[in-house]
């Protein structure tokens, strides 16, 4: 097929995306090739680049997120090759107007009043911007009705990208001016509410147009947060020689009739959603480690038989974290003791975490691709087809892909939060957490240390609000604009709610990370205390049970191994606050062992020199004299950084995450003896997460993963 010119661009196959893919299904499927982890790595790499080059067709959500979050650290460049196509459509509109051709929004009124006609094309565009400036910003400090700075920057970038494709009838100079605003970190003030994203985001986008045309009510925020009027904004940006634009026919419509605000904010949301969903997978693996979970739940055959790629990858990532984990090795030994007295399998929050997270990740990946198609789409009306010399009246401004993808993403985000809450609830509950103290209390006196009890209440609150936000927005459509816009996408509203949901998920993630680090440190403390208890019992047993009164070997010397097995079987935190208490399990079980040996001692019990019963009192008396001191010494040694046993986490693939939370952010092991509260530590992590600082340690945990599950052996 001969090449055709499409508004200044050359395409080998006319309007077909691919010769054998006229409906674009193959291209859409191919976008999901490769692992989610690889996609996240690509996003992060793009996010960190210092230049975004716009040509209309290759913009990514990570580039949008970078422009939104990094202000003037990232420069926007327009492809010079786009200039001809943009000019061609702009010229066509002017020629069409001069010929007297009747075109929507050029010679007609708008929407339900498009039956009106005018030859004053410039005045019509001016009126369009005036009547669309219908937003409310409010005053005072209690609330704001201004769209966040980051969302506005995202919208500006996406709108430029759309208009660069040359189907909208706007001058290239206007796009250059918006680019200058971005590069000089000058951000127009847009209203937070007032759009239904159906004839595009008309109301908020009209405020960008208002700044470009110098409307007296237009405002912007400068690079240092200062308030600017239009004149100051133009001067600071060095835009258009400081002259406001007099809009030509169609240019006002080109600026406002698009989905850029909804899709721009959706891009920001999905960049975060992809990272947080990956974090949820890694945190689930850490949860398995500190809970002494059974790693069998990650076995590849289980997930291969289910077929879902998200589940298979989630399991493979967890398997990678757990493979060779020092916690897993220790847990396997623990599970071998008294196996018939323990649950055969872990609870759902751990065992089915790949099955739970996998579909959510698939939803988020699909939404990501849907939004990437949207931000590279031409989404205004009418579209100027220079090659066929006509204006096409359609409805690409309908932002349904945004509303639907954001509703679906929010449901996935809520599901991730629900799993996180279920895992957190198990972690702090001493009935379920395999020996960790209730509320993860780390202090010496559990009666004066309630650990993460407040955090669990906060997590319940976060989770409840998150579940509420999972409700769809798109089923609340109202017929608008004299029943012309009778179905509308509510794309920006759904995007806003998704950003809210992500903020709550970050609150949950930061709280959960602090709790996981507390659990890691408690396991470290547990090991050191157990060793101290075993050593003390062994020494006391040797002194009191090994020999008789005359130095002869005593039958009770055979008790020592069984006494040490008691220590291995008993949860340390069930007794360690008062290790010699007769009401706690340690002393009860130790006495039980000695009594059982005494009962087996037979005739020797009648002889005072060989009686085990008569040794029990001496054993317990000496143990009470030395054990509390030894336990305290072990705790102090750990607090002083001189533990007898090193922290297992340093041998694990999850260590970079722990190191980041503990060392780089400087969070601490929490106890009731200290002033520091859980909320203060969670705040540090939340702030770091909001700045994107969690990304590097997260990816470092997965550095060695080859993108495939372990082979089935």
Curated annotation (Swiss-Prot):
Substrates-to-products reaction catalysed: L-phenylalanine = (E)-cinnamate + NH4(+)
EC code(s) of this entry: 4.3.1.24
Compartment(s) where it occurs, according to its Swiss-Prot or TrEMBL record: Cytoplasm
PROSITE patterns for this protein: PAL_HISTIDASE
InterPro entries associated with the record: Aromatic_Lyase, Fumarase/histidase_N, L-Aspartase-like, Phe/His_NH3-lyase_AS, Phe_NH3-lyase, Phe_NH3-lyase_shielding_dom_sf
GO biological process terms on file: cinnamic acid biosynthetic process; L-phenylalanine catabolic process
Keywords in alphabetical order: Cytoplasm, Lyase, Phenylalanine catabolism, Phenylpropanoid metabolism
Principal localisation: cytoplasm
Protein's job: This is a key enzyme of plant metabolism catalyzing the first reaction in the biosynthesis from L-phenylalanine of a wide variety of natural products based on the phenylpropane skeleton.
PANTHER family on file: HISTIDINE AMMONIA-LYASE (PTHR10362)
Protein name: Phenylalanine ammonia-lyase
Organism: Digitalis lanata (Grecian foxglove)
The organism's taxonomic lineage, starting at the top: Eukaryota, Viridiplantae, Streptophyta, Embryophyta, Tracheophyta
């Amino acid at each position: 097929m001969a090449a055709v010119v499409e508004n200044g661009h050359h395409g080998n196959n006319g309007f077909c995306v691919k010769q054998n893919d006229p409906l674009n299904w193959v291209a859409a499927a191919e976008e999901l090739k490769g692992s989610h982890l690889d996609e996240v790595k690509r996003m992060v790499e793009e996010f960190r680049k210092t230049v975004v080059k716009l040509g209309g067709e290759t913009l990514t959500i990570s580039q949008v997120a970078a422009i939104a979050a990094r202000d003037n650290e990232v420069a926007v460049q327009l492809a010079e090759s786009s200039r001809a196509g943009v000019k061609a459509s702009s010229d066509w509109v002017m020629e069409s107007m001069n010929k007297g051709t009747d075109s929507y929004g050029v010679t007609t009124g708008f929407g339900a009043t498009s039956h009106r006609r005018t030859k004053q094309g410039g005045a019509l565009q001016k009126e369009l911007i005036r009547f669309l400036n219908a937003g409310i910003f409010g005053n005072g400090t209690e609330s704001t009705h201004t769209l966040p700075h980051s969302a506005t920057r995202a919208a500006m970038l996406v709108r430029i990208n759309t208009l660069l494709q040359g189907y909208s009838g706007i001058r290239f100079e206007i796009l250059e001016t918006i680019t200058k605003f971005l590069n000089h970190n000058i951000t127009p003030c847009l209203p937070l509410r007032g759009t239904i994203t159906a004839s595009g985001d008309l109301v908020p986008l009209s405020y960008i147009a208002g700044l470009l045309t110098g409307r007296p009510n237009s405002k912007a925020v400068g690079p240092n947060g200062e308030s600017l009027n239009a004149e100051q904004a133009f001067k600071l940006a060095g835009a258009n020689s400081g002259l406001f634009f007099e809009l030509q026919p169609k240019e006002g419509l080109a600026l406002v009739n698009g989905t850029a605000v909804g899709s721009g904010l959706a891009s920001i949301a999905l960049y975060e959603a992809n990272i947080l969903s990956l974090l949820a997978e890694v945190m689930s693996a850490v949860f398995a480690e500190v809970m002494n979970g059974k790693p069998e739940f990650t076995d590849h055959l289980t997930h291969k038989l289910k077929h879902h790629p998200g589940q298979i990858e989630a399991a493979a990532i967890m398997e990678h974290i757990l493979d060779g984990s020092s916690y897993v090795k220790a847990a396997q030994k623990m599970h071998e003791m008294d196996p018939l007295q323990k649950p055969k399998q872990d609870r759902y929050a751990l065992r089915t975490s790949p099955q739970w997270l996998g579909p959510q990740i698939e939803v988020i990946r699909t939404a990501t691709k849907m939004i990437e198609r949207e931000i590279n789409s031409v989404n205004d009306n009418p579209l100027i087809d220079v090659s066929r010399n006509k204006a096409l009246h359609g409805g690409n401004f309908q932002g349904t892909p945004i509303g639907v993808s954001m509703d679906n993403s929010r449901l996935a985000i809520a599901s991730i939060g629900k799993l996180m809450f279920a895992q957190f609830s198990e972690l702090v509950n001493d009935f379920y957490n395999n020996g960790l103290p209730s509320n993860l209390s780390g202090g010496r006196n559990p009666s004066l240390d309630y650990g993460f009890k407040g955090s669990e209440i906060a997590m319940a609150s976060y989770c409840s609000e998150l579940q509420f936000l999972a409700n769809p927005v798109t089923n609340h459509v109202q017929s608008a604009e004299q029943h012309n816009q009778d179905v509308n996408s509510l794309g920006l509203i759904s995007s806003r709610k998704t950003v809210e949901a992500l903020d709550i998920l970050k609150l949950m993630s930061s709280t959960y990370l602090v709790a996981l680090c507390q659990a890691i440190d408690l396991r470290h403390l547990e090991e050191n205390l157990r060793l101290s208890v075993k050593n003390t019992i062994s020494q006391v047993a040797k002194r009191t049970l090994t020999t008789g009164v005359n130095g002869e070997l005593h039958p009770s010397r055979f008790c020592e191994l069984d006494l040490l097995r008691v220590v291995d079987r008993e949860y340390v935190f069930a007794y360690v606050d008062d290790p010699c208490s007769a009401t706690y399990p340690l002393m009860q079980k130790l006495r039980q062992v000695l009594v059982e040996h005494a009962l087996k001692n037979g005739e020797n019990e009648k002889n005072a020199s060989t009686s085990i019963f008569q040794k029990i009192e001496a054993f317990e008396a000496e143990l009470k004299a030395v054990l509390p001191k030894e336990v305290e010494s072990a705790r102090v040694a750990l607090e002083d950084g001189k533990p007898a046993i090193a922290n297992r986490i340093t041998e694990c693939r999850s260590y970079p995450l722990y190191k980041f939370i503990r060392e780089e952010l400087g969070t601490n092991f929490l106890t009731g003896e200290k002033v520091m509260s859980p909320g203060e530590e969670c705040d540090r992590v939340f702030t770091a997460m909001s700045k994107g600082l969690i990304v590097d340690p997260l990816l470092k945990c997965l550095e060695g993963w080859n993108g495939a599950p372990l082979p089935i052996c």
